[in-house]
């Protein structure tokens, strides 16, 4: 069975914080997703510390592509498409000077960047070259949750081990395509 994913032009061309959809938008979405997962599992208020580990190309180019900043902002619950750009620098200064961040903007935890945000430049996770691992600990440093995410391009992320679920579209897309050539052919035919 072939599962097709419907994409809009708005999925392909996005407004969001940069400079990179794979190295900035994706990691911010992954960090926010992990914080939301903690909340969904009822673990947010028991979380005393979170660590984020970057692998592969995220680790190699992370600081230059603002991946470190994206992780901090995502853990705070910010989203690349709705973030107030004027809030970025004050939030980062607060986190870095206090060595604390607010998970989802409301649960304050310790976060010492050199200890809690690690760049593994010589390692790659098995699922993709843009891999991240997030771990939440309680006050006794017991692991509450650990998840791996992959930034697969365009700001899209997948969580390792999460099964892909086919979503039934409410309506058939007007122009299905499997390649760039087919997309261009639809464009030419429609004018």
Language model feature labels by segment:
Residues 13-31:
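Conserved phosphate/anionic-ligand binding catalytic regions in large, soluble enzymes, centered on
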Residues 2-16, 52-53:
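Short, hydrophobic/aliphatic alpha-helical segments
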Residues 42-44, 107:
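Surface-exposed acidic, glycine-flexible loop patches that form ligand/cofactor-binding
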Residues 29-39:
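Short glycine/serine- and small hydrophobic-enriched flexible loop segments
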Residues 2, 39-41:
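Terminal domain-start leader segments
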Residues 74, 79-191:
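C-terminal regulatory domains involved in ligand/effector binding and gene-expression control
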Residues 45-84, 88, 92-95:
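A structural-propensity feature for long, helix-poor, extended segments
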């Amino acid at each position: 069975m072939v599962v097709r994913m419907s994409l809009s032009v708005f999925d392909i061309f996005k407004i969001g914080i940069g400079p990179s959809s794979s190295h900035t938008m994706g990691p911010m979405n992954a960090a926010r997703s992990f914080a939301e997962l903690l909340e969904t599992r009822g673990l947010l208020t028991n979380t005393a510390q979170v660590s984020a580990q970057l692998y592969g190309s995220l680790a190699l180019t992370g600081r230059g592509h603002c991946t470190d900043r994206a992780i901090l902002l995502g853990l705070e619950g910010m989203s690349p498409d709705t973030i107030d750009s004027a809030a970025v620098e004050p939030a980062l200064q607060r986190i870095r000077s206090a060595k604390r961040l607010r998970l989802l903007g409301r649960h304050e935890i310790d976060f010492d960047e050199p200890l809690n945000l690690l760049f593994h430049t010589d390692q790659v996770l098995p699922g993709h070259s843009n891999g991240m691992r997030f771990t939440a600990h309680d006050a006794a440093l017991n692991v509450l949750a650990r998840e791996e995410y992959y930034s697969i391009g365009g700001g899209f992320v997948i969580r390792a081990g999460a099964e892909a679920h086919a979503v039934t579209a409410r309506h058939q897309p007007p122009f299905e395509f499997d390649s760039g050539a087919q997309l261009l052919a639809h464009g030419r035919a429609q004018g």
